[in-house]
Design a protein with these regions (language model features):
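HhH-family (HhH-GPD) DNA N-glycosylase catalytic core used in base-excision repair
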Residues: 1-282
Length: 282
């Protein structure tokens, strides 16, 4: 068991709520205050188990034997998923009053960028719960069962999804164009067209993402937010954001949000999850 530290405060309850609402059955489980999931990387596979240790200020992590040879990679990915490197004091200084209600809120990332890209595409125009159910069906159909852990499957690899029949994906309950977009996404991951690590120029990376079929502006930005854990993403034309800024155009909202650079991703999450928030009069 290893302790991966965080800088307090850390709002574990909020993070669990966010991730649990999007949990993919068969891949991940929340239980007894902790989290378990299947994971595969560099030919190794196994289970990750973790739980918060509030007294020690960190996550207690246990890896199954299959993941021990890639333990450092696993720890780094866990750090990305749970945003353990975040300095909440810096966020508070940048966001000011916006961060006061939830000073320990973090930016949920991803263990695997390709997985997050698939989730982002499957989340288009459906509820969070429906997206999670649909993703679980894809995982069950194209993910490899984890033999040593009955009931768990590995999230499908790009290789597996690149060979999928679009009609079989459509039969799970998605439009044919979305099924075809998933297959293209998998092939783009294999060819390098889909950047799986954050590029030096995030804006250029976002433009590249939007050249892929089925990836529009919202999906590209949401993927960057979580798959790349980009810290300065804002969505001025997001439905909920527009509700929080009544009477303002997306251009005006974008101008307002400049005050939170270079941490607009954190501002976005705070605004999404603060029902009574309203912009200051200017």
């Amino acid at each position: 068991m290893v302790l991966l530290p965080w800088t307090p405060p850390y709002d574990w309850a909020w993070m669990v709520g966010f991730l649990q609402a999007r949990a993919v059955a068969g891949v991940e489980r929340f239980h007894d205050g902790g989290y378990s999931r299947s994971f595969g990387v560099e030919g190794h596979r196994g289970l990750i188990h973790l739980a918060p240790d509030e007294e020690a200020q960190g996550l207690r992590v246990t890896l199954s034997p299959g993941l021990q040879p890639v333990a450092e990679i696993c720890y780094a990915r866990i750090g990305q998923l749970f945003d353990l490197a975040c300095d909440p004091r810096q966020v508070a200084r940048t966001l000011g009053d916006l961060a006061q209600a939830r000073p320990g809120q973090r930016l949920p990332g991803a263990l695997d960028a390709f997985e997050q890209a698939v989730r982002a595409v499957l989340g288009q125009l459906v509820s969070v719960a429906m997206a999670a159910r649909l993703t679980a069906k894809v995982a069950a159909g194209w993910g490899e069962p984890l033999a040593e852990s009955p009931g768990y499957v590995l999230f499908p690899t790009p290789e597996a999804l690149s060979r999928a029949d679009p009609q079989a994906l459509k039969a799970l309950g998605m439009p044919l164009r979305r099924a075809e977009a998933l297959i293209h996404l998998a092939r783009a991951a294999l060819s390098g067209e889909l950047p799986l690590t954050a590029p030096a120029d995030i804006d250029a990376g976002l433009r590249q993402l939007q050249t892929l079929p089925g990836i529009g502006r919202w999906t590209a930005n949401y993927f960057a937010l979580r798959g790349w854990q980009a810290k300065d993403i804002f969505l001025p034309d997001d439905y909920l954001i527009k509700q929080r800024f009544p009477g303002m155009t997306p251009a005006a909202i974008a101008r307002y949000a400049r005050r939170w650079q270079p941490m607009r991703s954190y501002a976005l999450l705070h605004i999404w999850y603060t029902d009574d928030w309203a912009p200051a009069a200017e």
